[in-house]
């Protein structure tokens, strides 16, 4: 999926917005169903549960957190956006930090990542590790990635791993 985006004048990555280009025909209306519907429901607060997690109760879930200082040369693209793959890498680092020794060879079976925002080079981010569950050779966890400076949500991830 591709989109054209722009930043507001002087706003950096905190002000990124999707834009339409006059030279291109309008995009086809999105088909509702599947991931598009799931994403819309999550962002609007209508999705109550995902991967077995109560989405309305993040603050009450057992939480640990650590901060990451992304490297401008490795984690950002030429336009100054944090790479989507870096988000996933930070989730894997959180798993390794909080649970890795128990699951050194874990294999990802499913992962849904919902992106909400971005950061500028030089900003730190926080990964919150929420209510991991283990059982029957599986590890399921939810992570929130937040801008460390103001707590703004950057992404929400749900992962199922074989351990």
Region spans (language model):
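Residues in well-ordered beta-strands of folded domains
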Residues: 2-5, 69, 114
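Hydrophobic beta-strand-centered segment that forms part of the acyl-chain substrate-binding groove
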Residues: 94-135, 154-162
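A general secondary-structure signal for short beta-strands and their flanking turns/coil
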Residues: 61-65, 124, 138
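Beta-strand secondary-structure signal
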Residues: 67, 126-128, 140-142
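Hot-dog-fold acyl-thioester-processing enzymes
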Residues: 8-109
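HotDog/MaoC-like acyl-thioester-processing domains
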Residues: 1-39, 121, 131-163
């Amino acid at each position: 999926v591709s989109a054209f985006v722009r930043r507001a004048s002087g706003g950096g990555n905190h002000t990124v917005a999707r834009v339409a280009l006059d030279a291109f025909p309008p995009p086809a209306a999105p088909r509702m169903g599947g991931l598009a519907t799931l994403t819309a429901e999550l962002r609007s607060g209508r999705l109550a549960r995902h991967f077995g997690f109560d989405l309305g109760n993040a603050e009450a879930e057992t939480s640990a957190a650590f901060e990451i200082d992304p490297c401008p040369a490795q984690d950002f693209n030429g336009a100054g956006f944090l790479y989507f793959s870096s988000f996933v890498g930070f989730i894997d680092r959180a798993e390794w930090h909080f649970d890795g020794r128990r699951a050194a060879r874990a294999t990802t079976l499913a992962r849904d990542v919902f992106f909400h925002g971005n950061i500028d080079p030089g900003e730190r981010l926080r990964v919150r590790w929420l209510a991991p569950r283990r059982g029957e050779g599986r590890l399921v966890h939810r992570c929130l990635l937040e801008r460390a400076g103001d707590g703004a949500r950057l992404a929400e991830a749900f992962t199922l791993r074989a351990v």
